[in-house]
Amino acid sequence: HLDFRRQRQMCIRDSIDTPLLEELFPKGGILKQVHWESHNGRTRLPAHLNPPHTESDIRGKAGITFGRQIGAYPILIGAEYLIPLETTSDVVVTGHGARSITGVECSMNYDTITEKQLSAIPGIGSKSAWKLIGERVKLKRKDSTEVFPDIQSWFSTAGLSWQEDFAPYFSA
């Protein structure tokens, strides 16, 4: 009896819940003002209200951050890197689960973006992220104030091709 119930629940998740989320929150769609509320678990803990969870220097480090938009029954949004809690940001939808979605922040600064943030962007894997970070480090080693003139030249120097799909993730 319990196996039937569990199997039925999984069937509903696969055949109804996930397709519904994909329709309501399509990949590439932008969710405005996501409020970040917990790190490395869906449960908000008292420690999450204190440093280092709320400090800006945590942004882009390894971990998972969960957030929601304000609403009566908001969807859970996961980012595959740490974001300071008690902050809000706009997010591009990058994936779907049965009851939640995955996203990456919009308008990140290409001069300060981390490897974890880069590798969370669809089409940029871990190897490409490290190539980009490596090229930025080489440039900064010569002159710490120097920056690439634009994102496309940064990608080109790293031997990677720029795709217009990447544009929402970076600030101009």
Predicted stretch roles:
Residues 4, 87, 95-99, 152-164:
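Short glycine/proline-enriched turn or capping motifs at secondary-structure junctions
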Residues 1-14:
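Single conserved hydrophobic/aromatic residue that forms the stacking wall/gate
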Residues 138-139:
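A short structural micro-motif
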Residues 13-111:
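Terminal RNA-binding accessory module
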Residues 109-120, 134, 143-172:
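C-terminal extensions
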Residues 5, 72, 115:
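ATP/adenylate-binding site constellation spanning eukaryotic-like Ser/Thr protein kinases
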